[in-house]
Amino acid sequence: EIASCLVGSEMCIRDRCFGGINLEDIASPDCFEIEERLDQMLDIPVFHDDQHGTAVVVLAALYNALRVTKKDIKDITVVLNGPGAAGTAIIKMMHTAGVGKIVAVDEFGILYKDRQEGLIPHKRALCDITNPDNMQGTLADALKGADVFVGVSKPNLVTDEMVHSMNNNPIIFAMANPEPEITYQKAKACLLYTSDAA
């Protein structure tokens, strides 16, 4: 997959045939390598909609939710579950936008600097911009006192008890596809909720 993508790109360099490249449906972690290598090879924009398209929409939704809840982006804590292709881009975009604190969680728990298990290169890099307190634990631990949950992971991982442990007026973006991390019915204690189906 990586080789065929790069061969096609080399032809574009030679023929100067495109003004930009949109990558589609390339799984993590291959998508990171492909995007990085294309960025190095080409002098045109490279956009992976699974990463960047999702991140743009989530950030726009966050801005709106913060306006409704009257919270300041620099004062919030965001917990993101599922730092794959979309999750990584969401974290980077939220960091650039000035989110106060971001905590990333994967199937092994909270990402932190000294963790050994499952810390592949793109997740290790995320440790530089997330979890400034070097917190350890589970998704439930991460959600205590958090303002925002962003899920791009698996269905039914978030319980109503976890939502109740969050800060006042929590914002939930449960986007696992086809079923969200928590349903609206279970998260009805939340002020704002969205799912991939919305």
Functional labels for PLM-detected ranges:
Residues 117-176, 181:
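Rossmann-like NAD(P)-binding element
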